[in-house]
Every structure is written in structure tokens, then in C-alpha cells.
Amino acid sequence: MLKGAWQARIVTLFPEAFPGTLGLSLTGKALEMGLWSLETIDLRPFGEGRHRNVDDNPAGGGAGMVLRADIVARALDAASVGTPPERSRWPVVYLSPRGKPFSQAMARDWAGAEGLTLLCGRFEGVDQRVLDAYAVEEVSLGDFVLTGGEIAAQALIDATVRLIPRVLGNHASTEEESFSEGLLEFPQYTRPTVWQDRTIPEVLLSGHHANIARWRRAEAERLTKERRPDLWRAYCAARGRDPDEDREL
């Protein structure tokens, strides 16, 4: 690992799930180059008893099991060794469907930190007391439920790592893609010029960079307005525009 490289630490019952897809393609190459590092902290050894139990029945009754606060705390303590205490420099995140929605802005903030600790839940969740005591931020990948946080953790790390300098060969690509300016990305095309009687828009073949930029901006606005009205309203509000205006998108 290169000095000062971004670090990801994962507290999980399934350390064998990593690096998973993070070990492939550009993120995998960057991992090999030492541009970032990945460490898993197995929750099981911190468990109690002969079977290293990590969970117990939910207080008040109900289905499923809950990860115990004392056991999760020991794992978080192990994960925090050598990390700064300020959460802005090193966020500690619990992946939860009730958390704050993950966003590109969040990924940018994390990429600018020194590293990140992710707690992958299982069963019915984690005892709330440890989340409160350790100032753990709850983050959601979307409005759906997974059997555990490992898949979500890989997605969040991928979105963050690709923003680290030198991970992507072309930094400009991160500036043009979806959400970089609050808009969805414009449509992309490549050769052949004609495929099944469908042609690449003429403006993209014109070589006129200003016209291409205008077309891409208009398409990005059109798609955002059609598919993500929430993003469109926020985009317009930030620019003093009426979201219902008609600009021939």
C-alpha cells in the first residue's frame, strides 16, 4: 500500500465475500497498485461461548436475531486501531435500509477522507446502543432489503474508490457521468455509425464541440426531468430555475 492511500475496513461475518468484484477491473488493479487498501475484520471471533455467538433475541420479542452491542463494539474497536477519531476524516458506516440514501456526493466526501469503516449487518440488525455510542452513520443503498450488508458494501466502496486520483485512467469521465452535476448522464454511442437502421445522432459526428456539449447538456436535462423528477427539482432549485419550465428538452 502506498503511503497515505485510502483505506476500507469491513466488519463482517463473511470476510470471504471480499474483495469480490472489488478485486476486478480498475478497482482491482488500483488495489494491486496500492492506491487503496481493503481489510476485513471477522465479527465471529469476537463472539461469546464455544460457538462464538454474536447475536441474541430482540428485546420486546419478535422474529429474527439482533447483533449484540458488546460484540459489535469489540469489532469496531479492533477496526479503529490507527484511525483518526474525527468522523469527517474516517467515517464509520452501518449499511441499513433505514439509513440516509447513498449518493454521489457522499461518495465524494468519503473519497476525500483518509478511509472508511463499514459495518455489515445480518439478521434483524444491530443493537441501537452501539450505533449511538460509536456515532455510526446509517446509510442505505436503496429502498429494498438484502440478506446482509456485504453486497451493499462492495457497491459503496466501488463508487468511492473510483473517485480516488489515478484509479480511473481518465479523470474527466467522472465529471461527465450521472450525478456529477446533479443530472443523469447523457446517452452514449459508438461505432458502427448505423446499426439496425438506427443511426448515431448527427451532431455527435459533426466535430463541433460546442454543439456536442449543448446536445449532451440538453439530453442530460431531458432524461433527468423524465426519469428522476426529484433530482430535476433539486437541480433547478440550485440554479433558480422553474422545474416545470419548457426548454424543449
UniProtKB/Swiss-Prot annotation:
- Pfam families given for it? tRNA_m1G_MT
Work out whether the entry's keyword set contains tRNA processing: yes
The entry describes its oligomerization and partners as: Homodimer.
Entry function:
Specifically methylates guanosine-37 in various tRNAs.
Which InterPro entries does this chain map to? Answer: Alpha/beta_knot_MTases, tRNA_m1G_MeTrfase_C_sf, tRNA_m1G_MeTrfase_TrmD, tRNA_m1G_MTases_N, tRNA_MeTrfase_TRMD/TRM10
Q: EC top class, in one word?
A: transferase
Organism expressing this protein natively = Cereibacter sphaeroides (strain ATCC 17023 / DSM 158 / JCM 6121 / CCUG 31486 / LMG 2827 / NBRC 12203 / NCIMB 8253 / ATH 2.4.1.) (Rhodobacter sphaeroides)
Its recorded name reads tRNA (guanine-N(1)-)-methyltransferase
Entry-linked HAMAP family: TrmD
Instruction: Enumerate the GO terms in the molecular function aspect.
Output: tRNA (guanine(37)-N1)-methyltransferase activity
This protein's UniProt keywords: Cytoplasm, Methyltransferase, S-adenosyl-L-methionine, Transferase, tRNA processing
KW Cell wall biogenesis/degradation (keyword) present: no
GO CC annotations, alphabetized: cytosol
